[in-house]
């Protein structure tokens, strides 16, 4: 079964305004919204069944969640009624919050104790695939490098105790766990009362602003300071890796990995959750205590994710240890035919650019930029075929079957 979907858009303040937003223009071109307001930000385009942004089946005029609940034959035996994933297109003009996402156990606890700010009980591992050059902070730097930066940006030490100052040199060395030392230092800084914090943030940022030859790190700190003066998140680049993804490159964000997107466009896929623990660079609710206790303080090399390359040259993103989602890149030049694999799973296909006709059995749908189609589980020998009219790029998100997950472990990949 092939069914076009009407999906939702979120207007978070960090998104570009009007038609400068890829997420917004996709939503407009795909018929998901009637127009673009030039003065309104368009940050995220959602495809999924999450309660905060559920997709609807256009021709049946019902929520996709409702259709799946009443038509179990559209899914595989391993699927659970709702989509187990949430697919997004993000357009980022200003920085997102310093944040982490919880494990399953932590998600249950957060939701039970604070359902207003943690709207579900799930974890939220996620993969981000760049569509344009994409800048972000993610994962802790090498601890020895953090040690050097705490000396270089010495104003930060005004927030530490004498004991904590004396431990800066031990970051990256043996003895007491380097991660435990980092936790002490990071927690102290992030727990600093706002009034004291503002003084030190301002002092550091204004000194850097006076530099004639600013380093790349100087520039990021000053940039964050101009947007969030006095905010503890201004210090984040001192602790976290800064890097850029080029189009097609990806990063996988495990639970409790600190990160903040800074600029660019990407697609994201994650477990079906909207749980985010924030602590800086945001006017939204922040939860410093949960963040500093749950953070993974291990050092992380640049966390780029290397996908599987398929025989046709397209890419398949299969983060290990995650059974809720895989993402398949679907692309081809005008005049080509792309055949999707047999699948025990339902999937959603979101078109980034181009035009194509998708055929499955007797059903067919013409897809243009921004349109989204739900593809029911095929179960047998049926294979969806995509006849490409114009140069085409889309992403197919689905929940892999147990057989597919096992094939990943055996290094003999099966896509279903």
Curated annotation (Swiss-Prot):
Pfam families: PMI_typeI_C (PF01238), PMI_typeI_cat (PF20511), PMI_typeI_hel (PF20512). The lineage of its organism: Eukaryota, Metazoa, Ecdysozoa, Nematoda, Chromadorea. This is Probable mannose-6-phosphate isomerase. InterPro entries: Man6P_Isoase-1, Mannose-6-P_Isomerase, Pmannose_isomerase-type1_CS, PMI_typeI_C, PMI_typeI_cat, PMI_typeI_hel, RmlC-like_jellyroll, RmlC_Cupin_sf. It catalyses: D-mannose 6-phosphate = D-fructose 6-phosphate. Keywords: Cytoplasm, Isomerase, Metal-binding, Zinc. GO terms for cellular component: cytosol. The active site is at 278. Its cofactor is Zn(2+). Binds 1 zinc ion per subunit. The keyword Lipid biosynthesis does not apply. SUPFAM superfamilies: RmlC-like cupins. PANTHER family: MANNOSE-6-PHOSPHATE ISOMERASE. One of its GO terms (biological process) is GDP-mannose biosynthetic process. Belongs to the mannose-6-phosphate isomerase type 1 family. Pathway: Nucleotide-sugar biosynthesis; GDP-alpha-D-mannose biosynthesis; alpha-D-mannose 1-phosphate from D-fructose 6-phosphate: step 1/2. It comes from Caenorhabditis elegans.
């Amino acid at each position: 079964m092939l069914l076009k979907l009407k999906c939702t858009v979120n207007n978070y303040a960090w998104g570009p305004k009007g038609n400068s937003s890829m997420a917004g223009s996709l939503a407009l071109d795909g018929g998901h919204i009637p127009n673009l307001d030039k003065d309104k930000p368009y940050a995220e385009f959602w495809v999924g069944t999450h309660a905060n942004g559920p997709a609807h089946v256009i021709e049946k005029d019902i929520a996709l969640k409702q259709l799946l609940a009443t038509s179990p034959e559209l899914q595989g035996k391993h699927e659970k009624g709702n989509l187990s994933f949430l697919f997004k297109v993000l357009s980022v003009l200003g920085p997102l919050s310093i944040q982490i996402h919880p494990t399953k156990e932590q998600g249950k606890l957060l939701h039970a104790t604070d359902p207003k700010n943690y709207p579900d009980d799930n974890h939220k591992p996620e993969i981000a695939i760049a569509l344009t050059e994409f800048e972000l902070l993610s994962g802790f730097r090498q601890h020895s490098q953090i040690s050097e930066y705490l000396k270089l940006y010495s104003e930060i030490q005004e927030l530490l105790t004498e004991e904590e100052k004396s431990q800066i040199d031990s970051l990256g060395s043996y003895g007491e766990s380097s991660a435990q030392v980092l936790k002490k230092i990071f927690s102290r800084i992030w727990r600093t009362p706002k009034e004291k914090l503002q003084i030190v943030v301002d002092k550091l940022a204004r000194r850097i602003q006076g530099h004639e030859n600013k380093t790349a790190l100087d520039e990021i700190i000053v940039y964050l300071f101009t947007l969030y003066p006095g905010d503890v998140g201004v210090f984040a680049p001192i602790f976290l890796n800064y890097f850029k993804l080029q189009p097609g490159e990806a990063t996988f964000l495990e639970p409790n990995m600190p990160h903040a997107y800074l600029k660019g466009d990407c697609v994201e896929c994650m477990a079906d959750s909207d749980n985010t623990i924030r602590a800086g660079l945001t006017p939204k609710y922040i939860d410093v205590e949960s963040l500093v206790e749950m953070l993974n303080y291990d050092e992380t090399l640049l966390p780029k994710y290397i996908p599987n390359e398929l025989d046709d040259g397209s890419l398949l993103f299969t983060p290990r240890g995650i059974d809720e989602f895989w993402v398949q890149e679907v692309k081809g030049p005008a005049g080509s035919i792309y055949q999707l694999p047999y699948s025990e799973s339902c999937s959603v296909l979101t078109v980034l650019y181009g035009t194509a006709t998708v055929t499955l059995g007797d059903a067919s749908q013409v897809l243009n930029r921004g349109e989204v189609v739900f593809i029911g589980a095929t179960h047998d020998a049926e294979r969806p075929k995509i006849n490409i009219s114009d140069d085409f790029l889309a992403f197919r998100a689905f929940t892999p079957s147990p057989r597919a997950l096992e094939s990943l472990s055996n290094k003999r990949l099966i896509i279903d």
